[in-house]
């Protein structure tokens, strides 16, 4: 699933191609995504130019004078910039053709993605209204995590993956951040100290920054706006390394299921 670094990579990649470019046509080949693609999408987009490409959590927001286009990539979706005369491939469900002769194309094999239209303020939309802070926002601190976790018995890994606490920390990056902070993923969130939460908040920012700089993580099917894979998988310290030696102590990395997700950690370095 594309997580925050992958979505941010795509945001940065498509921005120069779509900002201030008038939409000249919209083609919806498959409207049945996670939610139906609006039947009036063409009327909302054609003739208008996008004024920006923003990201909120794992949602892309493309505002124009009439409203805002919301795109979510779901489990396996990708956005690419292609010449407008490029024939569609399998699972190319939505095309947004631009006056430049380029097209923003959504490919989504599993159809868990979304293309929606927002007429009001995006921050008031049901999908966005209850999200926590961005991990790079000033309000995301160890003190905030400590305060929100008091009395919580759930695993700290599940706690930091809760989008109401902080957005964009998916399974891969949660495992990596907890390892760097030296915190066992199964430790109860309410039993993590203020000092260790400060280390975790910094580790989250460091891991996400490194992943964005590497263009995201390719495990199955993530590619950027030009179809290139992300390379952060080459820098993973624990995720996907079950049985391999810890890079710090040499003990084999373990994998356990936490909250129905595979979680990787070192039993010596993480407490």
From Swiss-Prot:
It holds the Pfam family H2TH. Keywords: DNA damage, DNA repair, DNA-binding, Glycosidase, Hydrolase, Lyase, Metal-binding, Multifunctional enzyme, Zinc, Zinc-finger. The active site is at 2 (schiff-base intermediate with dna), 3 (proton donor), 58 (proton donor), 261 (proton donor). DNA binds at residues 91, 110, 152. Gene3D superfamilies: 1.10.8.50, MutM-like, N-terminal (3.20.190.10). Binds 1 zinc ion per subunit. NCBIfam families: fpg, PRK01103.1. This is Formamidopyrimidine-DNA glycosylase.
């Amino acid at each position: 699933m594309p997580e925050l670094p992958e979505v941010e990579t795509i945001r940065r990649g498509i921005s120069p191609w779509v900002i201030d470019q008038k939409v000249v046509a919209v083609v919806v080949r498959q409207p049945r995504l996670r939610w139906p693609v609006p039947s009036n999408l063409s009327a909302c987009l054609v003739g208008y130019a996008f004024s920006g490409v923003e990201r909120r959590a794992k949602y892309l927001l493309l505002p124009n004078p009439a409203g805002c286009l919301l795109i979510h990539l779901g489990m396996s979706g990708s956005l690419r910039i292609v010449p407008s005369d490029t024939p569609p491939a399998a699972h190319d469900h939505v095309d947004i053709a631009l006056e430049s002769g380029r097209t923003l194309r959504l490919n989504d094999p599993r159809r868990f993605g979304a293309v929606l239209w927002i007429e009001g303020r995006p921050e008031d939309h049901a999908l966005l209204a209850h999200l926590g802070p961005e991990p790079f926002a000033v309000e995301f601190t160890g003190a905030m995590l400590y305060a929100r976790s008091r009395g919580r018995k759930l695993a700290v890994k599940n706690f930091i993956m809760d989008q109401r606490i902080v957005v964009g920390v998916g399974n891969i990056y949660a495992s990596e951040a907890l390892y760097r902070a030296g915190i066992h993923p199964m430790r109860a969130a309410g039993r993590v100290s203020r000092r260790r939460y400060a280390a975790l908040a910094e580790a989250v920012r460091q891991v996400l920054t490194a992943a964005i700089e590497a263009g995201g993580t390719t495990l199955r099917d993530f590619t950027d706006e030009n179809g290139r894979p992300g390379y952060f998988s080459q820098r993973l310290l624990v995720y996907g390394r079950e049985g391999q030696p810890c890079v710090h102590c040499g003990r084999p990395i373990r994998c356990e299921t936490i909250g129905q997700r595979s979680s990787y950690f070192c039993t010596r370095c993480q407490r």
